[in-house]
Design a protein with these regions (language model features):
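Non-heme Fe(II)/2-oxoglutarate
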Residues: 1-56
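Eukaryotic intrinsically disordered and solvent-exposed regulatory patches
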Residues: 51, 77-78, 132-134
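Acidic, glycine-rich loop-and-strand cores that form catalytic or ligand-binding grooves
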Residues: 54-69
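Conserved short histidine dyad/triad with adjacent acidic residue
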Residues: 65-83
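Catalytic core of Fe(II)/2-oxoglutarate
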Residues: 71, 82, 86, 97-152
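Short hydrophobic/aromatic beta-strand micro-patches
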Residues: 93
Length: 152
């Protein structure tokens, strides 16, 4: 379940721990959540400046740690929707010692796609809108860890 919502494992098969708005008030959890919020917001500000998005304001709404084991995947989707109007999406790659589990962006109105190279300590930021449909291919070996976040 995700926030009381049943997850269809045919669409999304991944272990998840939500960090923001968490009930666990342990010092370690609060510390890591605060550090991630600080770093992600720092990179969002750089992204906004690099793309000259004047008067653009948003803040991290949700942070999740994801664990994809063998067979774990996420079918093609966009992060923005009517229930959660996300503006920017972020993914932080933790490790690379797994096979499969590729982050792929599909270019709309074409058959082309962009496969993001696996690199630990890499942060990818993109607009959450319909122009950036993406998926995670099934993991075939090892375990894929990542941290994802969204800004509203």
């Amino acid at each position: 379940h995700e926030g009381g919502m049943k997850i269809d494992t045919e669409v999304r098969n991944v272990g998840m721990k939500i960090l923001s708005n968490i009930q666990d008030k342990s010092f370690t959890t609060v510390h890591w959540t605060s550090l991630l919020l600080y770093k992600f917001n720092e990179h969002i500000n750089r992204y906004v400046n690099d793309f000259k998005m004047s008067n653009f304001q948003c803040a991290i709404n949700d942070i999740q740690i994801l664990k994809y084991t063998k067979g774990g995947h996420y079918k093609l989707h966009c992060d923005h929707g009517p229930a959660v109007p996300r503006t920017l999406s972020l993914i932080y790659f933790v490790n690379e010692d797994y096979e499969g589990g590729d982050l792929i962006f599909k270019l709309i109105n074409t058959n082309n796609e962009i496969k993001i190279e696996k690199k630990p300590n890499r942060l990818i930021i993109w607009p959450s809108n319909f122009m950036y449909p993406h998926c995670v291919t099934p993991v075939t070996e090892g375990t894929r860890y990542s941290v994802v976040a969204w800004a509203l």
